[in-house]
C-alpha cells in the first residue's frame, strides 16, 4: 500500500473509532478472540470430533433437530452439564413446558445452578433470551423448542384462525438482535427444532424444520439427530443407537457424522465411544473379543471393557487424550514429552 492510501486508511480508522468507540474496527490478526473459539463438549466424543473443533462453539447460534424421541433434549442437557463443569452459567427456556429435573440431574446437570424459564408465548421467550444474552453473565442458553414458540396473536386468537408466517417473522426479527449480542457476550444460543413434512414434494426430501428460514442462515452449526436402532440387554431395550449428522458447519468442514449409544436414564455411553475410537486409531488393541491397552488386557467384550474403564478413569482419560490428539490435532502431553526426550537423546549423540 502506498503512503497516500495508508494515510487515508489511518484517518478513516481514527474517525470510525472516534465516532463509534475503540475496537469498533481492527485488523483480524490483532483480535485473538476472533481466532480462538471457546467450545463446550457435547458429552459425545464422536460428535465432538465430527464437529471438527472439539465441541459446540460459544458466541454462536446452534440448531439441533430431528424426529420425536431421537435424543435432542438429552444431547442439549449433556452439553449444559459439560458447560457447568467448565464453571459456566446456563439457562433453559422451556417453551414446551416439559423439562424433567430428575432426568436432567441423572445426566449430570446441576439443577440448583440452572436458570429455568417457562414463558407464556414466543415473544416473551425470545425477549428473555435476548436479555440474558445481553447481560454478559450467561455462557449457554437452550431454547426447547422453536416449534413451541407460539406468537402472542395466535395464543390470543381463536382456534381456527389463520396466522400465516407469524412465527417465521418472529424468529427472523429475534435472530437479527440475538446473533450480534451472542458474539459480543460469548454466549452460545442453542435452539432445539422439530421436523415437519412439506406437502406435494415429488423430488428430494419432503422434510423441513419449523420457524422459517432465518435460523438456517444465522446458525453456525446445524445438527440432524436420528434414532437408527435399539440397544438391547437380552430382550430388554435399554437405549437408542443414534446417528448425528453435521448438516452445516461454519467452524470446520460440514457433513461429518457420528454414531453412538444413548442409554435410557444415563445419556451417551461415553466409555463405549472411547473404546471404539481407541480401536480405530490403534490406541486400544483388539484380538478376537479381547480388548487391550498397552500390554494389559482390559476386558473380554465391550461391556467388560467399559466396566474396566469405569473403574480406572485415569486410563480412560489417557486414551481419550490420545484420540483427541489424533483426530483433532489437540496436543497430547505424553506424546510431546516422548518427542522432547528423543530429541534430547539425538542431540547428545556425537555426529558421525
From Swiss-Prot:
Provide the binding site for ATP: 66-73
Its Gene Ontology cellular component terms are:
cytosol
Q: The organism sits in which domain of life?
A: Bacteria
Key words, A-Z? ATP-binding, Cytoplasm, DNA damage, DNA recombination, DNA repair, DNA-binding, Nucleotide-binding, SOS response
Q: Which GO terms describe its molecular function?
A: ATP binding; ATP hydrolysis activity; ATP-dependent DNA damage sensor activity; damaged DNA binding; single-stranded DNA binding
Q: Which SMART domains does the entry link to?
A: AAA
Where in the cell does this protein reside?
Answer: Cytoplasm
GO biological process assignments: DNA recombination; DNA repair; SOS response
Q: Which CDD domains match?
A: RecA
InterPro entries named in the record: AAA+_ATPase, DNA_recomb/repair_RecA, DNA_recomb/repair_RecA_CS, P-loop_NTPase, RecA-like_C, RecA-like_N, RecA_ATP-bd, RecA_C_sf
Keyword DNA-binding assigned to the entry: answer is yes
Principal localization?
cytoplasm
Family assignment from sequence similarity: Belongs to the RecA family.
Q: What does this protein do?
A: Can catalyze the hydrolysis of ATP in the presence of single-stranded DNA, the ATP-dependent uptake of single-stranded DNA by duplex DNA, and the ATP-dependent hybridization of homologous single-stranded DNAs. It interacts with LexA causing its activation and leading to its autocatalytic cleavage.
Q: How is this protein named in the record?
A: Protein RecA
Q: Which organism is it from?
A: Psychrobacter arcticus (strain DSM 17307 / VKM B-2377 / 273-4)
The encoding gene is recA
Amino acid at each position: 500500500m502506498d503512503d497516500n492510501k495508508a494515510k487515508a486508511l489511518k484517518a478513516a480508522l481514527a474517525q470510525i473509532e472516534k465516532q463509534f468507540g475503540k475496537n469498533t474496527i481492527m485488523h483480524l490478526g490483532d483480535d485473538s478472540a476472533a481466532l480462538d473459539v471457546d467450545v463446550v463438549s457435547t458429552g459425545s466424543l464422536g460428535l465432538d470430533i465430527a464437529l471438527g473443533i472439539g465441541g459446540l462453539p460459544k458466541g454462536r447460534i446452534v440448531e439441533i433437530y430431528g424426529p420425536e424421541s431421537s435424543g435432542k433434549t438429552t444431547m442439549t442437557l449433556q452439553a449444559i452439564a459439560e458447560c457447568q463443569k467448565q464453571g459456566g452459567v446456563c439457562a433453559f427456556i422451556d417453551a414446551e413446558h416439559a423439562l424433567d429435573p430428575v432426568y436432567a440431574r441423572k445426566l449430570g446437570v446441576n439443577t440448583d445452578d440452572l436458570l429455568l424459564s417457562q414463558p407464556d408465548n414466543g415473544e416473551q421467550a425470545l425477549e428473555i433470551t435476548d436479555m440474558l444474552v445481553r447481560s454478559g453473565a450467561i455462557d449457554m442458553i437452550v431454547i426447547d423448542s422453536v416449534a413451541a414458540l407460539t406468537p402472542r396473536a395466535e395464543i390470543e386468537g381463536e382456534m381456527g384462525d389463520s396466522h400465516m408466517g407469524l412465527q417465521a417473522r418472529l424468529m427472523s426479527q429475534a435472530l437479527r438482535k440475538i446473533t450480534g449480542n451472542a458474539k459480543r457476550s460469548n454466549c452460545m444460543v442453542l435452539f432445539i427444532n422439530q421436523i415437519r413434512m412439506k406437502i406435494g414434494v415429488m423430488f428430494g426430501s419432503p422434510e423441513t424444520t419449523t420457524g422459517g428460514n432465518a435460523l438456517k442462515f444465522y446458525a453456525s452449526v446445524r445438527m440432524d439427530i436420528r434414532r437408527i436402532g435399539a440397544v438391547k440387554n437380552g430382550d430388554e431395550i435399554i437405549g437408542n443407537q443414534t446417528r448425528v449428522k453435521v448438516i452445516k458447519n461454519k467452524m470446520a468442514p460440514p457433513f461429518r457424522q457420528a454414531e453412538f449409544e444413548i442409554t435410557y436414564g444415563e445419556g451417551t455411553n461415553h466409555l463405549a465411544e472411547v473404546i471404539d475410537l481407541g480401536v480405530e486409531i490403534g490406541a486400544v488393541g483388539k484380538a478376537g473379543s479381547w480388548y487391550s491397552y498397552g500390554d494389559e488386557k482390559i476386558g473380554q467384550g465391550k461391556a467388560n471393557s467399559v466396566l474396566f474403564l469405569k473403574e480406572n478413569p485415569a486410563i480412560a482419560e489417557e486414551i481419550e487424550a490420545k484420540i483427541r490428539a489424533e483426530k483433532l490435532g489437540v496436543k497430547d502431553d505424553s506424546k510431546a514429552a516422548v518427542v522432547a526426550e528423543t530429541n534430547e537423546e539425538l542431540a547428545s549423540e556425537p555426529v558421525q
